[in-house]
Amino acid sequence: MDAIELRMGEMRRYIITMIDEHSDYVLALAVPSLNSDIVNHFFSRAARLFPVGISQIITDNGKEFLGSFDKTLQEAAIKHLWTYPYTPKMNAICERFNRALREQFIEFNEILLFEDLALFNLKLAEYLALYNSKRPEYRRASRAKPDH
């Protein structure tokens, strides 16, 4: 799980991303601000949509992954693993998805992200549906894709 920060002038937007390392199933949501409560809300909704149960989460040491989010993980008996500072390779699968998301979607919709967040999220959901079910390349051919 990770967050992407984007800026346009003084404005900031964030995209929270989450990927299952076994199936490559991904979810993401653009938000106007980022804190533990927002990440917790995203995670609570995302956990219901994931095709498999969640046993552990890997995040960086951002403050948005502490507080109510970390408490929710503890209550659900989900192991929370933190990466070491400045070591993106420890969360490489999520970081690689973030790069693909930037190159394949955000670059073409960045203005919309700052002008109409709801419409951006609608288009993001369409992109993720395609990414999760019909993308031509798979990171690992042996991985099973969810049947949706």
Please give the residue ranges for each predicted region.
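C-terminal domain-tail junction helix/linker
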Residues: G67, A76, R99, E103-H148
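An active-site-proximal beta-strand-loop segment
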Residues: M1-L27, S33
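Active-site beta-loop-alpha junctions of metal-dependent nucleic acid enzymes
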Residues: M11, L29-V52
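Short, well-ordered alpha-helical microsegments
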Residues: N40, F65-F69
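Short small-residue beta-strand/loop micro-motif enriched in glycine and branched aliphatics
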Residues: D24-L29, L81-T83, E107-F108
